Swiss-Prot record:
Record GO biological process: bacterial-type flagellum-dependent cell motility
Protein name listed in UniProt: Flagellar P-ring protein
Single GO MF annotation: structural molecule activity
Primary localisation category: periplasm
Key words, A-Z: Bacterial flagellum, Periplasm, Signal
GO CC entries: bacterial-type flagellum basal body, distal rod, P ring; outer membrane-bounded periplasmic space
Protein encoded by which gene: flgI
Family named by the database record: Belongs to the FlgI family.
Pfam families in the record: FlgI
Compartments (UniProt record): Periplasm; Bacterial flagellum basal body
Role played: Assembles around the rod to form the L-ring and probably protects the motor/basal body from shearing forces during rotation.
Assembly, per entry: The basal body constitutes a major portion of the flagellar organelle and consists of four rings (L,P,S, and M) mounted on a central rod.
Length: 360
């Protein structure tokens, strides 16, 4: 099953690599057209005994301070916070957001709360990197997991200490932005000199003037021509199609065993030997009881079982130069995803893999 999955992934990437062009908006980001991040500290209340414990002093102090601001002085030592949890609230604000716009927020416990299920986030100011308050968040927390706990056992699904509040924040003031500019930068998501020059040439041809200039492998600086507003000009630019130059790359996720290979990966003839040595050691302590009424003592005697299994090496010679032939050759010798990762690393070290090897 693992081998089939790898073959399907390769086939998909081959189709992608044969695409003739892409819109500029799909491969690049226009200066200023990005998300902004906000963060805040708040309290979630109304939990069913799954909140922070007494050891979480900042939760106790935060609750006492909030009640004091409401005109209710309390002694922090008398506060029980099992129905309250201290949380960090994070949000991603869309570009060019205006005052009054609503957006989602994510709520994450920072204490020892067991679950945020059923809780309500109290009014929490959200600040930007400059320390200024841009939005206020409040609302019912929706949790994708749960925790069921008894005296002797507990069952947890997903992460109940993280939740979301759809449209839980409202922007109080516009984010800083100036619409009066004469030039703009376009940043490629994947820096490449060939693609940068292609973007430059496509824009210049579309407007009939040399208004675009590739500054480096990632940046194209564009002057807005006379007679165009920034919105009209950028709307036309971002929909222009440009041919892209993809880099031959093999991506390996060592934790999950997933291998992604592009269709333009070149491989020279190489012989691959795959084998493994499995050593299994089991410790089974055995309790030995003395005979009844004897002066002996109960002893624990170790029982060790050692098994060593060496699989025969499988040798295959890869003569093809395409990704599909490489995968078929590795599958033909019954290589597992882990072994395929080791093989690719060895082929790269031998200089037979003509592609960048990236290990996640």
């Amino acid at each position: 099953m693992a081998c089939k999955n790898i073959r399907y992934i390769v086939s998909l990437l081959i189709l992608v690599s044969l695409t003739f062009g892409a819109r500029i908006k799909d491969i690049a980001t226009i200066e200023g057209n990005r998300y902004n991040y906000l963060i805040g500290y708040g309290l979630v209340v109304g939990l069913k005994g799954t909140g922070d414990g007494k050891a979480t002093q900042f939760t106790v102090q935060s609750l006492a301070n909030m009640l004091r601001r409401m005109g209710i002085p309390v002694d922090p030592r008398r506060i029980t916070v099992k129905n309250v949890a201290a949380v960090m609230v994070t949000a991603k604000v869309p570009p060019y957001a205006k005052a009054g716009m609503r957006f989602d927020v994510e709520v994450s416990s920072i204490g020892d709360a067991k679950s945020l299920e059923g809780g309500t986030l109290l009014m929490t100011p959200l600040r930007g990197p400059d320390g200024k308050v841009y939005a206020i968040a409040q609302g019912q927390v929706i949790v994708g997991g749960y925790e069921a706990r008894g005296r002797g056992a507990a069952q947890v699904k997903n992460v109940p200490t993280v939740g979301r509040i759809p449209n839980g924040a409202i922007l109080e003031k516009d984010l800083p932005f100036s619409a009066d500019f004469k030039e703009v930068n376009i940043y490629l998501d994947e820096p490449d000199f060939t693609t940068a020059k292609n973007v430059q040439d496509v824009i210049n041809r579309a407007f009939g003037k040399n208004i675009a200039k590739a500054v480096d492998s990632a940046t194209i600086r564009v002057k807005i021509p006379e007679g165009y507003s920034p919105v009209d000009f950028l709307a036309k630019v971002e929909n222009l199609e440009v041919s892209t130059s993809s880099v031959a790359k093999v991506v390996i996720d060592g934790r999950s065993g997933i291998v992604l290979l592009g269709g333009n990966v070149s491989i020279e003839p190489v012989a691959v030997a795959v084998g493994s040595l499995v050593v299994e050691i089991k410790e089974r302590p055995e309790v030995v009881q003395p005979p009844p009424l004897s002066p002996g003592e109960t002893k624990v005697v170790p029982r060790t079982e050692v098994k060593v299994k060496e699989e025969k090496k499988r040798l295959v010679q890869i003569k093809g130069t395409t990704v599909s032939e490489l995968v078929d050759a590795l599958n033909s010798i019954g290589a597992t995803p882990r072994e395929i990762i080791q093989v690719l690393q060895a082929i790269k070290s031998a200089g037979a893999l003509k592609a960048k090897l990236e290990v996640l």
